[in-house]
């Protein structure tokens, strides 16, 4: 049986901020198996974001084996972010 997906503590704030800016945001963290945390729609484009918590030590912010494997196999873009600001930079 698969363990429940862990959601980074900063995810709720990022989701709220993006929604307030007019983005559609769907958490897909519960899919697990390395799938990114958020699917974001903004100005007719989709973005996949893996969220890492900047409050954790750097060794705890690296991609897991599953996350890395998923990203290497994915034929689209996916970005790792730690803040709303980084998400907005990626969507600019």
Where are these regions (language model features)?
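Catalytic phosphate/metal-binding cores of nucleic-acid and nucleotide-processing enzymes, i.e., regions
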Residues: 1-92
């Amino acid at each position: 049986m698969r363990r429940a997906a862990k959601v980074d503590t900063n995810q709720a704030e990022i989701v709220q901020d993006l929604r307030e800016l007019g983005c559609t945001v769907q958490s897909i963290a519960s899919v697990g198996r390395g799938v990114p945390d958020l699917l974001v729609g903004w100005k007719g484009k989709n973005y996949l974001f893996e969220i890492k918590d900047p409050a954790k030590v750097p060794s705890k912010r690296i991609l897991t084996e599953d996350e890395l494997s998923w990203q290497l196999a994915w034929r689209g873009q996916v970005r790792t972010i730690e803040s709303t600001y980084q998400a907005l930079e990626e969507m600019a």
